[in-house]
Amino acid sequence: MLPIRSAGLTRLAAFTPLMGRAYSDGRNYDPGPGKPSSVSALSPYIRHRLIMEQEVVAAAIAAHGAEVADKFIQEVFWRSYWKGWLAQRPAVWDAYRACVAAGLAAPPEGYEAAIAGRTGIGCFDAWVQELIETGYLHNHARMWFASIWIFTLRLPWFLGADFFLRHLLDGDAASNTLSWRWVAGLHTKGKHYVARAENIARYTGGRFAPQGELNEKPLPVQEPDPPAPRPVPNVAAPPSGPVTLLLHEDDLHPESLPLAGLHVQRVIGLCCPGARSPLGAAPLVQRFVAGALEDGLGRAVQHFGVSAERVALDELPEILRREAVVMPEA
């Protein structure tokens, strides 16, 4: 999977004919890595805004109409919903980070076997290897994985979310954290997702059939309710005069940024995938993010007609001291 916008657009064009009935009928089936699938695998491009949600939804509606493409469009909107929900409740992210740090400092029994794919549960162990080797899992497999992690292996949900965030090419703070909370029963109180052997066998085409291996009657995880939503802070007014545009891994589509009236004098790029976890990010993720940033910087040079360079995190304080910097909202 090439981390460039043109590759994302090629994948988008190829999948557009499947965004209607083919997607709604086949989206739950996971044929396995390298096999033709009814899911798009566009999420790494959308997550870094190499391609935009609007482009994807517009393609679906143009090809199939909103009603026929409804299931596919809903999946795109889930990502936006998660980001908005977490932006209004930043304490949930802070609590998650604190729990991960404490959990990794003293990992519970069974954790090392789980992340090495040595649990003895065939489907789970296979998904661990697939995730590590490809940086991707089918969405249904992600739900099964999370449910087995939480309810069968009885491991903390936040350590599973951290494992995903380290390895997923589309790893996103909001989507990943809140999806794991939803499986655990923490997002919608009393509603948790339970992986069942029959369901896994059916939707993997019989590749896996973990009969008798799963806890299929668990209770939801219990934690205090999340805080009430609070308004997202207003974005500061842009400065006058020349500005430096800071691109980062959360938004690499500089062509669409609302910068009318601003004079972009240069572009700088920053990526910090290692900040996703106390254990950093997997090499696959680091390479994808670095490549995506280079692609975004290259397009920024063409769009604004200025120079662009990648900078390190420790260079930012000095840049912010001497230049007026604008950046996309994360």
Model-derived features with residue positions:
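Active-site helix-to-loop segments that bind/position phosphate- or nucleotide-bearing substrates
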Residues: 117-120, 124, 134
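C-terminal, helix-dominated tail/subdomain
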Residues: 168-224, 326
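Long hydrophobic alpha-helices with heptad-repeat/coiled-coil character
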Residues: 3, 137-148, 159-163, 212-239
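Long, low-complexity intrinsically disordered regions
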Residues: 92-113, 183-185, 193-204
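Proline-centered flexible-loop/turn and helix-kink motifs
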Residues: 90, 119, 191-193
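Trp/Phe/Arg-rich N-terminal binding region typifying the photolyase-homology
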Residues: 1-107, 116, 129-133, 156, ...
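Structured ligand/cofactor/substrate-binding pocket environments in proteins
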Residues: 68-81, 128-183, 188-191
